[in-house]
């Protein structure tokens, strides 16, 4: 089970975008994440009329290392760590380490 999943709200803890918050759009296989509004790059796009793509300079989100972000805890308004807890029925859930509240409600 992954500590950070799609649609989690995360905060960048190191790097040029330190302090920015965003939602995880995609989790890549090599411990990298695509987070909305974070790690914006400019890509020089070549036009492709067959696919209907206009050329020019476009801005898009680049992957960011998962170790450079932390999950955002709305109860404390701070970055938090993720722990796991077994429920009585045998399911494993993610919890915030600071207050023990479940992330997946």
Curated annotation (Swiss-Prot):
Keywords: Ribonucleoprotein, Ribosomal protein, RNA-binding, rRNA-binding. NCBIfam families: rplX_bact. One of its GO terms (molecular function) is structural constituent of ribosome. CDD domains: KOW_RPL26. One of two assembly initiator proteins, it binds directly to the 5'-end of the 23S rRNA, where it nucleates assembly of the 50S subunit. Belongs to the universal ribosomal protein uL24 family. Part of the 50S ribosomal subunit. SUPFAM superfamilies: Translation proteins SH3-like domain. PROSITE patterns: RIBOSOMAL_L24 (PS01108). GO terms for cellular component: ribonucleoprotein complex; ribosome. This is Large ribosomal subunit protein uL24. GO terms for biological process: translation. InterPro entries: KOW (IPR005824), Rib_uL2_dom2 (IPR014722), Ribosomal_uL24 (IPR003256), Ribosomal_uL24_CS (IPR005825), Ribosomal_uL24_KOW (IPR041988), Translation_prot_SH3-like_sf (IPR008991). It comes from the Bacteria.
